């Protein structure tokens, strides 16, 4: 029998601007998914503690921004360890999207992959926040390019390569190609709540709509030849009221939920939850036949037989850039460029 892995893709609304409440809900969803046989669960972009939708209405809001910082999640914090402990207790891998808070109160759009054993296998930051997201979040660095890890599911499944990107990172050809090159089998495409496009005459970008974003995830599946867990959040009247987004470009109507599972050839494998009501919460489940990845790549492997690295290749700098480098720890290349004045 072919190895099969049950996955769970959340379509849920966070407890907006409430770290403790969202962590509690996260653990409840992890438990629910595990009780239904899932061995991996995916969460959307900035699930903890909600995507800051007000930035698309008013980029400067000191009160909300400050509250958002205080309610963002720090790596190694008790709240993070609570999520990891829940994953370990239920032997389920967790791919978590969150607003990361550093010790200096900077924020990053981050993702973590937690193993069924409770270990943090991956912590990465979005390479470049999109448009007005830059009013809140900083950039990732070289280490964040390594975004695929080996997850040991044990039993008949064993080790599977799982990776993640956030939102419009799925528009970046070089970043996608680098991710493919790491041998990814299951990819989590994390998105915020996203709404259908209003129509051809509307000035809003189709590529930011529910249809456009799913198209990007399906394209990713085709190019990468692996399964894609397309994970979106939900925003109801509660979120709109909390963030004051009724008159904003985005988050002005209840909805946003369009989670699904996409096969290695790009086809959608699951039906919309609740008859397609994007304001309803739930979990999408799918049983993945991992041999389909092998079969698909016998036709198309963009980082293998279906490529020409002798003609086209990608250069990568994976070094993490530090803000402060002591002089005695400078790289040789930096030292070589230092000009020491002659002593008279």
From Swiss-Prot:
Supply the EC number(s). 3.5.5.1, 3.5.5.5
| Reactions it catalyzes | a nitrile + 2 H2O = a carboxylate + NH4(+); 4-chlorophenylacetonitrile + 2 H2O = 4-chlorophenylacetate + NH4(+)
- Keyword annotations for this protein? Aminoacyl-tRNA synthetase, Hydrolase, Ligase
User: Where in this chain does the record put each CN hydrolase domain?
Assistant: 5-290
Q: Which Gene3D superfamilies match?
A: Carbon-nitrogen hydrolase
Q: Which domain of life is it from?
A: Eukaryota
Please give the Gene Ontology molecular function terms for this protein.
aminoacyl-tRNA ligase activity; arylacetonitrilase activity; hydro-lyase activity
Region of interest (Disordered), ranges: 324-344
Q: What class of enzyme is it?
A: hydrolase
> Which residues does the entry assign to the active site, renumbered to this chain?
45, 126, 167
List the InterPro entries hit by this protein, alphabetically.
C-N_Hydrolase, C-N_Hydrolase_sf, Nitrilase/CN_hydratase_CS, Nitrilases_CHs
**What role does it play?**
Nitrilase that hydrolyzes preferentially phenylacetonitrile and (R,S)-mandelonitrile. Also acts on dinitriles like phenylenediacetonitriles (PDAs) 1,2-PDA, 1,3-PDA, and 1,4-PDA, and cyanophenyl acetonitriles (CPAs) 2-CPA and 4-CPA.
Give the record's family classification. Belongs to the carbon-nitrogen hydrolase superfamily. Nitrilase family.
Name assigned to this protein:
Arylacetonitrilase
């Amino acid at each position: 029998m072919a190895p099969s892995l049950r996955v769970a893709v959340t379509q849920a609304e966070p407890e907006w601007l409430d770290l403790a409440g969202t962590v509690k809900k996260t653990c409840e969803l992890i438990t629910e998914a595990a009780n239904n046989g899932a061995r991996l669960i995916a969460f959307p972009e900035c699930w903890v503690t909600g995507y800051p939708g007000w930035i698309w209405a008013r980029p400067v809001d000191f009160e909300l921004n400050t509250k958002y910082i205080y309610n963002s999640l720090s790596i190694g914090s008790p709240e993070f360890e609570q999520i990891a402990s829940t994953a370990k207790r239920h032997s389920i891998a967790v791919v978590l999207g969150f607003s990361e808070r550093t010790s200096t109160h900077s924020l990053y759009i981050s993702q973590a992959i937690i193993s069924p054993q409770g270990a943090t296998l991956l912590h990465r930051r979005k390479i470049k926040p999109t448009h007005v997201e830059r009013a809140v979040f900083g950039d990732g660095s070289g280490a964040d390019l390594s975004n695929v890890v080996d997850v040991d599911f044990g039993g008949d499944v064993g080790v599977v390569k799982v990776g993640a990107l956030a939102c419009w990172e799925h528009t970046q050809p070089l970043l996608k190609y680098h991710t493919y090159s790491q041998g990814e089998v299951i990819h989590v495409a994390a998105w915020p709540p996203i709404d259908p496009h209003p129509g051809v005459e509307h000035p809003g970008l189709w590529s930011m709509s529910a249809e456009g974003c799913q198209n990007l995830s399906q394209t990713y599946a085709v190019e990468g030849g692996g399964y894609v867990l397309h994970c979106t959040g939900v925003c109801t009247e509660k979120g709109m009221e909390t963030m004051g987004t009724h008159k904003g470009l985005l988050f002005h109507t209840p909805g946003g939920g369009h989670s699904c599972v996409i096969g290695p050839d790009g086809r959608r494998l699951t039906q919309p939850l609740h008859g397609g009501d994007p304001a309803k919460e739930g979990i999408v489940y799918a049983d993945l036949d991992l041999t389909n990845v092998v079969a698909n790549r016998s036709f198309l492997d963009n980082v293998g037989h279906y490529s020409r690295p002798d003609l086209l290749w990608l250069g990568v700098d994976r070094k993490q850039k530090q803000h402060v480098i002591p002089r005695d720890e400078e790289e040789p290349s930096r030292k070589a460029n230092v000009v020491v004045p002659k002593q008279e």
